Amino acid sequence: MKTFAKVITLVILISLLAGCGGAAPTAAPEQPAANTESQAAEAPAEEAPALSPKEEWLKANQLGPYTTDTQDWAAIEEAAKKEGKVVVYANSSKIAKAAENWAEKYPDIVIEGYDLGGDDVLSKTVGEQQSGTIVGDVWFSSGGAEIVGNVLPNEYVWRFVPDTASVAPEFSDPLLMSRLGTTILAYNSELNEACPVTNIWEVTQPEWKGKFVIEDPLNDASTLSKLLAFVYHADEMKQAYVDLYGSEPVLDADTPDAGWLWLKRFAQNGPIPQPGGDEVDSAFATPGMTENYLAFTSYSNYPDVQEGNLAFEPCWGVEPISGVQAQSYLAIMNQAPHPNAAKLFIKFIISEDGRDPWAKFGTFFPDPTYVVPEGMLTIDEVMKVTWLIPEQFAYENLVQARDFYLLNLGKP
């Protein structure tokens, strides 16, 4: 019994001594074992957002963000044959002859080429795209300011440049140019040995009041866009004024620069409006005329001079410029029902066989390998004496310019 009491006493003493020494450090809790299985398993990948029908069409046809630099033409032609048809909206009557050439080369692919005129190509394209009922495959028209201000921003057409194309970058952006239409300052060659003006400001002088013929810019957006080229190049117009008069132009309250001042004075000088290009030529260049006129006319009408039906010559060398170029474009309609046939048509129409109906004196192609007819300027030469229509500027200023022109037309 005494032994048991001694054991109890010893245990109590040990406990008391431990208490006097302070609390023993607490062991850190053990970390839970890592779940190596869950770490090894990858998190489920997020699903890519589904493509819209338009995006699927673009991806399938390698257009837009899916464009490639090269094309497999054998595969494209085979796919085009399966599509069986291509529908082209053009603004030239020569599309009929081009369609004949196409039929000889691609008899298995029916071509429907429509000469709609520039305004109708635009309205038909916009109407189809907005309704979602797409019929057309190829845009083959100018479009002017509407191209950059409406058609391209709304993705109604898509850029396509065949890898067979021989064009400089400036002729393939924002779309591939098919040809250039040159409007030139011209004079009656029976009544003048040379151009009677050397500076574009001279056409605003009293001598030429009511003596300048032009396609009506109030009813033709293309003509008004060409006049806006002179407004856009305000610095060059200012320098031309200084070269002619020896001092800087005095601006009016409604003319912020020399470009707008020229347009105002041009309108005030009462140019004679005509409904179309043929009427312009008849009004200033009919053989046997006795009244002297100047005009803005199409250089592509020069074959009529060579055949003796008209009498005019271009005013090459006028300061600061002799004319304005209107761009004609090729593009594939958004969600075209026959996209491969559309690609094949664009490749064809920029080839020698395809462009043949337009390969006449006065028409320029952006292909540097094209040999121009004898006596005609080359594309490099004509680009030095003409301006391109500034399409974005024209889009932003067409309404204002039309009102401005009308307000000043024929005013003293």
Language-model regions: role of each:
Residues 1-83, 412:
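Short, low-complexity disordered leader/linker segments with a strong preference
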Residues 79-81, 131-134, 151-152, 176-180, ...:
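Extracellular/periplasmic catalytic domains that process cell-envelope and extracellular macromolecules
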Residues 88, 132-141, 273, 290-298, ...:
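Paired acidic/hydrophobic, glycine-rich loop segments that form the ligand-binding mouth/hinge
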Residues 89-100, 112-126, 134-285:
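Extracytoplasmic ligand-binding site segments that recognize negatively charged/polar headgroups
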Residues 145-150, 292-312:
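A ligand-binding cleft/hinge motif common to bilobed small-molecule-binding domains
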Residues 167-169, 180-183, 262-266, 308-334:
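Periplasmic-binding protein-like
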Residues 323-392:
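Mature extracytoplasmic/periplasmic domains
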Residues 384-412:
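Tryptophan-rich aromatic "cage" segments
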